[in-house]
Amino acid sequence: MALSSVEPTEAPRATGFGALTLGSIGVVFGDIGTSPLYAFREAVHVAAEGAPVTRVIVLGVLSLILWSLLIVVTAKYVLLLLRADNNGEGGTLSLMALGQRALGRRSVPLLVLGVIGASMFIGDSMITPAISVLSAVEGLKIAAPALQHYVVPLTVGILVALFAFQRWGTAKVASAFGPVMVLWFSTLAVLGLLHINDDPSVIAAINPWYAVEFMLSHGVIALVTIGAVFLAVTGGEALYADLGHFGRKPIQAGWLFFVLPSLLLNYFGQGAMVLAHPDAVENTFYRMVPENLLVPMILLATAATVIASQAVITGAFSLISQAVQLGLLPRFEVRYTSETHAGQIYLPRVNMLLLAGVLLLVLLFHSSSALAAAYGIAVSTTMVVDGVMGFVVVWKLWGWRPAAAAALIIPFVAVDAIFFSANLLKLMEGAWVPLLFGFLMAMLVWTWRRGSAMLILKTRRTEVPLPDLIRSLEKRPPHIVRGTAVFLTSDPEYVPSALLHNLKHNKVLHEHNVILTIETAQTPRVDLADRVRMESLGDKFARVRLRFGFMESPNVPKALVIARKLGWQFDIMSTSFFVSRRSLKPAAQSGMPRWQNGLFIALSRSANDATDYFQIPTGRVVEVGTQVTI
């Protein structure tokens, strides 16, 4: 279940190795840890095609699940990609930035891959809460069959409450995530151990020959089954995405010594139970639970799926925030839900869109079995993307020869490609849903990038080079007023439009003028020593560049305090910040199709105010409006 390109989710910061490992169990593995609710059941259903379940099917599916977890999650992510960190951070956009840094330039193919991976995550992040909570609540069908009609309404209620809760943040409850998930995984292990005794011969599925035999004997159905088996590894990419919060070794320890054994024990327990009691295949997970413990188990499963969903939601907020910083999307409103952890953020518009998408899926598909067909295509796409970008890192950054790097990465990409192909077979059954969401997301990114580039070209024609203006003002100085004026601009080589308008309409110039540019680095964070760069342009002008990492929240006043230490006499109370606000109008002749032009204008108008985004005191801001046709 996909934290696919999940860009790191926020978790309570802990310092000790044990605390970090516990924290990782609560956040990193919540997604993949709820897969036993439906993964084995769906794979067996697909393989059997309505016929009686055979021993070949059970052992074949179990062997496929085992070796998928070992190859895709353990070998690729835990042992390989966790080492490919970008200043300690992981995730698709971090990997993209790392690859571009390794190449020493902005690579269009890598950018496209990064956008595809991020877009697929947004599409998949709507399915994860829906299928997770649905699968947990469906336990009511066994505990109290008369309540089965309340499964969907109850699921909707839980999801609405979950998304409504986002505005208050998770800081107060996040500390409970680890213990709850430890209880969950321990329960999985105990249930599995108890039921392996139903048919101990199920252990034979450790032999990969059973997976091979199943694929050879079932033809096309085997490929379709692989698509269902993939449900067991979705969420594995979250191990890499959350690298920055917990570190490589705690995640590796949590996976290798606790989570992976618990998952395998549970899957093998489900398999043994089906071999002994074939009718249990209807809902293999809840049939493992003693009848008198069904209700507590449903409550625990619901808590686990809510935690897994929370990780995805937080990951979506983090991903969108990074995309904004990298210039892939307009500035969305960001609210900070914690005074101590800058990474705990809430994006109201994104939250509403996610909730709408999740509820639409629940009401459209009604059950986790139906949603399973829609699940996996986005994660498998992201895994292919991670593999390809991982090749660039191994080759360019780690210094491997191309042949050696290919020999290492190609087997993983080949396995990912098989899963991708298998999930494509489910296209008409529902896999089109995350693809549609991902396509819409990619369309927004493409439109914003294309429109922004055209806007720069459009305004460049009328802009004045900054050195030319300074020379002109030295020859004909205007009236000088006391104080400092800071002009925000995206291009420090040209005169900000707000400065031109101030000179044109007010006929004044401040005694100190700062041309301020805010840049986003290709690293998650920037050291304070590299935050500020100052350049004197004469007695009245200075050029200041502020650099932030793509995972940082840009705070201009705090950054300018650093400038004071570099010699700039800066007083916030005698400083005015001049911000240009462009009003876009559609041109008769545009370089984009009319629909895309209109979409770009709508995105531009929806962007959050620069004053709020850069956390500038509103009482010190002067906004200057300009109208631009595009």
Curated annotation (Swiss-Prot):
Belongs to the HAK/KUP transporter (TC 2.A.72) family. It comes from the Bacteria. It catalyses: K(+)(in) + H(+)(in) = K(+)(out) + H(+)(out). It comes from Rhodopseudomonas palustris (strain BisA53). Transport of potassium into the cell. Likely operates as a K(+):H(+) symporter. InterPro entries: K+_transporter, K_trans_C, K_trans_N, Kup. Keywords: Cell inner membrane, Cell membrane, Ion transport, Membrane, Potassium, Potassium transport, Symport, Transmembrane, Transmembrane helix, Transport. This is Probable potassium transport system protein Kup 2. The chain crosses the membrane at residues 14-34, 56-76, 108-128, 145-165, 176-196, 214-234, 255-275, 293-313, 352-372, 375-395, 402-422, 427-447. One of its GO terms (cellular component) is plasma membrane. It is a multi-pass membrane protein. It holds the Pfam family K_trans. The keyword Transmembrane helix applies. One of its GO terms (molecular function) is potassium ion transmembrane transporter activity. It is found in: Cell inner membrane.
